[in-house]
Amino acid sequence: MIDTTQDTRKIVYISLLVAMSVVLHTLEQMIPLPSPWIKFGISNIATLLALVLLGFKEAIIVTLLRVLIGSILFGTFLSPTFMLSLMGGVSSAIVMGVFYKFFPRYFSLIGISLFGAYAHTTVVIILVYYFIIHHKELFYLLP
């Protein structure tokens, strides 16, 4: 028998986390930063919460919906920025999911988030190198 109450609850939690993520993403856009390519990644909090509270698949869903809705709100849907954000966000969620599942005794959520940030940055720089800017000096931006 299908437990519709549990399914409904999960959908509500995912919706709330996506909404929280989009709000944090919007607030992050308003913060003046010293350089255009550096962000704090505060909307990643929702992905971490989804990972801990709901599971890996739901964390990926929250990430995908955050990138999709955020890109529609800011007019970057299907642009290179959208593609980079999508690939970086998904790679970050995957890495955080792996570290949360296999190494929870060794890393706190902050450490897991740092690995996710590193994965995001690395994937974005590699994609920018192969598809946009073909200069090896770009790799000096890696952390």
Predicted regions and their residues:
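Loop-helix junctions at membrane interfaces
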Residues: 1-143
